[in-house]
Each structure stands twice: as structure tokens, then as C-alpha cells.
């Protein structure tokens, strides 16, 4: 990261992430970030990946992955986690 980032707590970050999800034009119903960690300056979001009964990805899994990737890109440039 080249830019200075702002500190943010986990709960506030998840609220902002879920607001972005709800307002995103490509979102699907039910996508929600329920957890976040930070690895090497990158925020990693987690939640339900909508796997099938065998634990395999579904069409919705790809949408979730792409949304969490979008959140990581957008929010890692702005924030770093503080607990």
C-alpha cells in the first residue's frame, strides 16, 4: 500500500462493507460479509459462499467471491484494522 490508511474497528468496517454490497449494482440477495481479517495490508472478507450439499461452489458462490474481492480492493486502500 502506497497511501496512508485510516484505522477502523472490525464492526464499523463490516457495516461499511455490507452497505457497499447492498448498494452495488451487481449484488445478489443474501450476500453479506460476516467477518474480516487483515493479511499483509489486505482486508480479507468472509461470509456464506453458498456451497451446495457436497460443499461445491454454485453460481452464487462466484458472485460472493467477486464481491468480497471488490471489497478487499476498495477498502484496503482506505483502512487498516484495529482491535
Swiss-Prot record:
InterPro entries: DUF2498 (IPR019633), YciN_sf (IPR038191). It holds the Pfam family DUF2498. It comes from the Bacteria. NCBIfam families: PRK11037.1. This is Protein YciN. The gene is yciN.
Amino acid at each position: 500500500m502506497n497511501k496512508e490508511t485510516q484505522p477502523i474497528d472490525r464492526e464499523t468496517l463490516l457495516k461499511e462493507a455490507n452497505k457497499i454490497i447492498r448498494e452495488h449494482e451487481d449484488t445478489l440477495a443474501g450476500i453479506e460479509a460476516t467477518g474480516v481479517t487483515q493479511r499483509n495490508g489486505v482486508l480479507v472478507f468472509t461470509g456464506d459462499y453458498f456451497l451446495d450439499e457436497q460443499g461445491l461452489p454454485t453460481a452464487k458462490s462466484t458472485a460472493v467471491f467477486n464481491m468480497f474481492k471488490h471489497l478487499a480492493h476498495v477498502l484496503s486502500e482506505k483502512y487498516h484494522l484495529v482491535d
